[in-house]
Regions:
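A fold-level detector for beta-propeller and closely related beta-sheet-rich head/sensor domains
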Residues: 1-563
């Protein structure tokens, strides 16, 4: 803060901004604007990683000074209202040494070079408001930083001669996402975080939204290219009743920015195309990374360079897709579950099965046996196997599927998952489907309901023959269930323990005072090290809704012996 009429000695920094172009450059040395540029351009803490969050106007990631200036009600020869620092016209900066008013212009110039703001306050209340404005600007930068969150665990995979770490993230300021690949220091074994090898979001931005992307969807009976002319009439109307608007929304979803507000259109602005990746962590199989996004798509990225190989839009999320283009968009979930990708030996196929988590009630499956060879939308459409939804026993599909071989030779491989939460019937139910057709082989209903649902299962192979014997899964009522799949006929698969014909859990988790402790995560199972049976390890707790945030009830980690 100053009256602007500085009279100090020269800072001797030179003409630091002289080579920066408009609106930063001038022809004068040792000005206040030069000082601001000196501490903006140079790393003020070179020993730290360059991870400073960026904004639209400040793209520097190194540690730097941002300059905010407030003059005490005095003005220079330039009127800031006559110029647009971001888009032009730009000011021609005068020589600060030629007069006091020119020094005020230099004060504004310093704020421009330092990517801050310039304010003038002629009264005490103006000064207070100016300081509040600066604080709000700083807080918005901090909020932008805190909005960036890492999704899931770090994924380490060997790619050729190198080991890479893949990490997904999302930014709640604009709801965008990214997957980045980082190298590993061969001497220290540490992740090299100062730079990344590729960014999927960056790669997608350079891809032509129309001709460069391979995207498919599903009609309810077959895969189709994600093109307006290929959609069913129902899908077209779900986008919009007006064909032109529906076509434009589909183009927007593919990545067309021409109809965004900043370009004079009716759709919301996006920082970039790739949507937020909140709960769906990347899965690496055969050089490909698969992850679900809340842009309505499952994405397949090349692990070598981050380019998108293809994307899939489940028909299950179609009814809400148009909301992604709404200028009043509030965040929604779409393809939010980590997919399962497994080579199925009995089919000689690699199958991907994914769910929606908070995005809806349903699962989908793709044949990804030769994912890197899919070069057209028609070819991708032919790899869509099935979608499953519309079942009153099926809730929001939080349960991560398991693909295993079974003892029923007429059935072969199976997909197993819990029914999730908030189903119409509200019981805890185990689903067993055919991985190639999506047909229901068996539903095992525990009979325990009233706002219940079965969480992610774990399959146990007791004799190492690559065939599932038992399945464990918890529910919202704190029950840990065991399912017996050892019979050679799927019709005999059932809950392992019963009393008088009524299914009984292995254990029920209860806290102090008998309060039920929900089980929402997959258990781990290991052999007892000295005796028969298995130790089932799991933790309780729920983080599914707003009430869970403030819930302070006691939760517990259990290890139970099932023998």
């Amino acid at each position: 803060m100053t009256d602007g009429y500085y009279g100090g000695t020269s800072p001797s920094v030179g003409n630091v901004d002289g080579d920066n172009g408009a609106p930063y450059a001038d022809g004068y040395s040792d000005t206040l604007a030069d000082v601001a540029m000196e501490y903006y351009e140079n790393d003020l803490a070179s020993g730290l990683d360059d991870l400073v969050p960026t904004t639209d106007t400040d793209t520097a990631t190194h540690q730097h000074m941002v300059t905010y200036s407030v003059s005490f009600g005095v003005y220079g020869t330039l009127n800031p209202d006559d110029y647009d620092i971001e888009n032009g016209p730009y000011p021609t900066w005068p020589n600060p040494g030629s007069g006091d008013q020119q020094k005020i212009d230099d004060l504004w110039h310093a704020a421009v070079n330092g990517r801050g703001t310039f304010l003038s306050a002629s009264r005490p209340d103006d000064l207070v408001n100016s300081l509040l404005s600066i604080m709000q600007h700083i807080e918005s930068r901090i909020a932008s930083a805190s909005a960036v969150s890492v999704n899931g665990d770090e994924l380490y995979e060997k790619l050729g001669a190198d080991i890479l770490m893949f990490q997904a993230s999302y930014n709640s300021d604009g709801w965008t996402g990214d997957v980045k690949a980082y190298g590993i220091d061969t001497e220290t074994g540490q992740v090299i975080t100062t730079s990344y090898q590729w960014s999927a979001a960056d790669e997608l931005e350079t891809t032509n939204w129309d001709t460069g992307r391979i995207i498919a969807t599903y009609t309810g009976s077959a895969g189709i290219p994600f093109r307006y002319s290929s959609l069913t009439s129902t899908q077209q109307n779900q986008l919009n009743a007006d064909p032109t608007t529906a076509q434009n929304i589909l183009n927007f979803l593919r990545g067309d920015a021409s109809n965004e507000e900043s370009n004079g259109g009716p759709f919301r602005d996006r920082y970039w195309r790739l949507g937020d990746l909140v709960h769906s962590s990347p899965v690496f199989v055969n050089g490909v990374l698969y992850t679900g996004g809340n842009d309505g798509m499952l994405h397949a990225f090349s692990a070598s360079d981050g380019s998108e190989l293809f994307a899939y839009v489940p028909n299950l999320v179609f009814e809400n897709l148009s909301q992604l283009a709404d200028t009043e968009y509030t965040h929604k979930y779409y393809v939010d579950l980590t997919p399962t990708v497994k080579y199925v030996s009995s089919l000689d196929k690699t199958i991907l099965v994914g769910g929606l988590a908070k995005g809806g009630r349903g699962y989908y499956a793709l044949d990804v046996s030769n994912a890197t060879s899919i070069t057209s939308e028609t070819a991708l459409a032919g790899k869509v196997l099935w979608e499953y939804g519309g079942d009153d026993d099926l809730g929001y599909t939080f349960s991560k599927p398991v693909i295993v071989e079974s003892y029923d030779s007429s059935v072969g491989a199976i997909v197993i998952f819990g029914n999730g939460y908030s189903s119409v019937n509200e019981n805890a139910v185990l689903y067993i489907l055919n991985p190639w057709t999506g047909a229901v082989i068996k539903k095992i209903d525990t009979g325990v309901g009233s706002c219940n649902g079965l969480s992610s299962p774990v399959a146990v192979d007791v004799d190492y023959d690559q065939i599932v014997d038992y399945v464990y899964a918890g529910d919202l009522k704190g029950n840990m269930w065991k399912f017996d799949l050892t019979a050679s006929s799927s019709g005999s698969w059932d809950v392992a323990y019963k009393s008088g014909g009524t299914p009984k859990p292995v254990f029920q988790a209860k806290g102090p005072g008998g309060a039920i402790q929900s089980i929402t995560t997959k258990p781990d199972v290991m052999r007892h090290c000295e005796k028969d049976g298995y130790i089932v390890v799991f933790a309780t707790g729920s983080y599914l809704g707003e009430t869970d945030v403030s819930d302070t009830s006691t939760q517990t980690i259990y290890g139970i012996w099932d023998y």
